[in-house]
């Protein structure tokens, strides 16, 4: 028993110094020789990044009078052809088109300090979701019907993914004048 104990102690004693040499000692920061004290002045401005002079065409969104609603709200109002292209996009992705309408096109605070159910977060659904719809003209016809029934309301189109059960796209189809 004693001989086996001594053999294991000797093995541990031999392994100790070998393990400590596996980790390199910390030498501190690099020497200052690697960092030049002076830099050559570069007066050549042609090497600086540039946007190609396109700054003059950028515009600032006016803070008053123009509300941003949802996707594509920064664009001018969409024509019927543009709406049809967007609806075709959501149909190609196998999303279910839904049409909703609301008096206010944005969240507002009327009944409480934070928005609630009656403060524009939830829109009223126009009829039922259009399950099985394969043609954009069907959706456009429903939007036109909603516009006739509620001309002073906002109308939006939603693309709903029924596999993931999430809303994938939402955009304003009609803004009242």
UniProtKB/Swiss-Prot annotation:
Task: Give any single GO term for biological process.
Answer: reductive pentose-phosphate cycle
Q: Which Pfam families does the entry link to?
A: RbcS, RuBisCO_small
Inducing or repressing factors: Accumulates to low levels when grown under continuous white light.
Which domain of life does the protein's organism represent? Eukaryota
Q: Which GO terms describe its molecular function?
A: ribulose-bisphosphate carboxylase activity
- Where is this gene product found? Plastid, Chloroplast
Q: How does it assemble?
A: Heterohexadecamer of 8 large and 8 small subunits.
Which family does the UniProt entry place this protein in?
A: Belongs to the RuBisCO small chain family.
Protein name (Swiss-Prot/TrEMBL): Ribulose bisphosphate carboxylase small subunit, chloroplastic 5
């Amino acid at each position: 028993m004693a001989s086996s104990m001594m053999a294991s102690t000797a093995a541990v004693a031999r392994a100790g110094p070998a393990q400590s040499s596996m980790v390199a000692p910390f030498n501190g920061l690099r020497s200052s020789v690697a960092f030049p004290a002076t830099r050559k002045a570069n007066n050549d401005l042609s090497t600086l990044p540039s946007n190609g002079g396109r700054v003059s065409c950028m515009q600032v969104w006016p803070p008053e009078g123009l509300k941003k609603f949802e996707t594509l709200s920064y664009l001018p109002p969409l024509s019927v052809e543009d709406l049809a292209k967007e609806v075709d996009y959501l149909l190609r992705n196998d999303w279910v088109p839904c049409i909703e309408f609301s008096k206010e096109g944005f969240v507002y605070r009327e009944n409480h300090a934070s928005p609630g159910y009656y403060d524009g977060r939830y829109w009223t659904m126009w009829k039922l979701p259009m399950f099985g719809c394969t043609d954009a003209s069907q959706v456009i016809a429903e939007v036109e019907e909603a516009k006739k029934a509620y001309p002073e309301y906002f109308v939006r189109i939603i693309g709903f993914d029924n596999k993931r059960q999430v809303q994938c796209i939402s955009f304003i189809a009609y803004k009242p004048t």
